[in-house]
Amino acid sequence: MALIYPDNLRYFDSHEYVRLDGDIAVIGISAYAIDQLGDIVFLELPEVGSTIAIGASFGTVESVKAVEEVYAPVTGEIIERNEAALEAPEILNSDPYEQGWLLKVQLTGKPDLSDSYDAAQYQALVEGQ
């Protein structure tokens, strides 16, 4: 199955993505990372009201193959976490971008996306691995 990388997202080396909506960032894990992990069986995410800082680990994703940390691509306060994904983590396998997002974050300042990739750049990066 071909992996999809939506054009409206920014992607990072650690395989998280960000969708910006004004000063709100939606954070998730790319289809490539999900494909590499296999079937997702457990998620651990911080509580609403917590803050995350760019580059810091904020949770874990457990699959049948491995447990991986998830890193914050932006800094801000968590205003929503995906409770549906926490209850049924396999949703990340079927729809990592729409239903399988992880957190919504109120940004602290303007996000630094200089280390991010657009969809075409990210696809070239992961297909070269």
UniProtKB/Swiss-Prot annotation:
GO terms for cellular component: cytosol; glycine cleavage complex. Keywords: Lipoyl. It comes from the Bacteria. The keyword DNA-binding does not apply. GO terms for biological process: glycine decarboxylation via glycine cleavage system. Pfam families: GCV_H (PF01597). Belongs to the GcvH family. The glycine cleavage system catalyzes the degradation of glycine. The H protein shuttles the methylamine group of glycine from the P protein to the T protein. The glycine cleavage system is composed of four proteins: P, T, L and H. This is Glycine cleavage system H protein. It comes from Synechococcus elongatus (strain ATCC 33912 / PCC 7942 / FACHB-805) (Anacystis nidulans R2). The gene is gcvH.
